[in-house]
């Protein structure tokens, strides 16, 4: 077992207005915990001050916690998350969005599940106890329609596949993310790249026979979100179809 308990992976693209507060909130929370931790910031080729802010944060917290910054070319969130997860050193790895839509305090719901033997703990904006705060109705409706299609085509057991707050045991994270087929090449993209990679992550977990727990969490809609509900929904649906086709071709079969 690793001496480091928790790795927090934070992908960030052009987040200069939100990243400093997010990182300070995460670090302040973790400093109050009895376990060892690290924060892994993956700068997704930002054009603003995001990368510099992350580097400054790492220097400021030197000696108080392990802070690492990875500078990627702009290849999209999926590639950034995969980079961070595969380089995480903790026994458990949790990734979250740079806007901290799910408060860091919600991690206390995920870690006990991982400690009790679950391989993956999935934050969910649906189910008893979940809270979706400030979300426009049309966004919620589109999300529900998308998830119904996901349940029909790929993974039928989850009420919410897209919440950006997911935790893994280290061995499980390595097994899952090494088997992903979408967005794994360092191909540069333009603009925000919101994809359906969460669906592929959960599908691979299912194919590997891993134990997955879906956990209702608190989630806040953030103004200035980079999600384009129409364009990104179409891309996500395309990704779901690609996952289904990959599955039919046996590309996720355990070896």
Regions found by a protein language model. Name each.
Residues 1-28, 35:
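N-proximal low-complexity "stem/linker" segments adjacent to membrane-targeting elements
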Residues 1-5, 179-255:
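Hydrophobic helical membrane-anchoring modules
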Residues 15-18, 46, 77, 103:
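Donor nucleotide-sugar binding loop of glycosyltransferases
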Residues 30-35, 59-66:
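Short helix-capping segments at alpha-helix termini
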Residues 35-46, 70-71:
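Short beta-strand/loop segment that forms part of the nucleotide-sugar
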Residues 43-52, 100:
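A conserved acidic beta->alpha catalytic loop
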Residues 66, 70-87, 92, 104-189, ...:
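Acceptor/aglycone-binding surface of glycosyltransferases and processive sugar-polymer synthases
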């Amino acid at each position: 077992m690793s001496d480091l308990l928790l790795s927090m992976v934070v992908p960030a693209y052009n987040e200069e207005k939100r990243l400093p507060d997010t990182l300070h909130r995460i670090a302040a929370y973790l400093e109050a915990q009895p376990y060892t931790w690290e924060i892994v910031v993956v700068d997704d080729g930002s054009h603003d001050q995001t990368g510099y802010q992350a580097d400054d944060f790492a220097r400021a917290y030197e000696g108080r916690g392990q802070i690492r910054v990875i500078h990627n070319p702009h290849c999209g969130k999926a590639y950034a998350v995969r980079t961070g997860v595969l380089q995480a050193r903790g026994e458990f790895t949790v990734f979250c969005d740079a806007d901290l839509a799910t408060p860091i305090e919600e991690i206390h719901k995920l870690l006990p599940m991982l400690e009790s033997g679950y391989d993956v703990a999935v934050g969910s904006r649906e189910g008893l106890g979940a809270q979706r705060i400030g979300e426009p109705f049309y966004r919620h409706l589109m999300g529900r329609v998308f998830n119904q299609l996901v349940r029909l085509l790929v993974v039928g057991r989850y009420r919410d596949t897209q919440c950006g707050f997911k935790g893994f045991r280290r061995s499980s994270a390595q097994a899952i993310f090494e088997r992903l087929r979408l967005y794994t090449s360092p191909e540069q993209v333009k603009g925000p790249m919101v994809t359906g990679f969460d669906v592929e992550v959960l599908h691979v977990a299912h194919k590997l026979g891993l134990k997955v727990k879906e956990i209702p969490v608190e989630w806040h809609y953030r103004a200035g979100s980079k999600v384009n509900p129409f364009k990104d929904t179409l891309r996500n649906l395309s990704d779901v179809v690609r996952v289904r086709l990959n599955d039919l071709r046996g590309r996720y079969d355990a070896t």
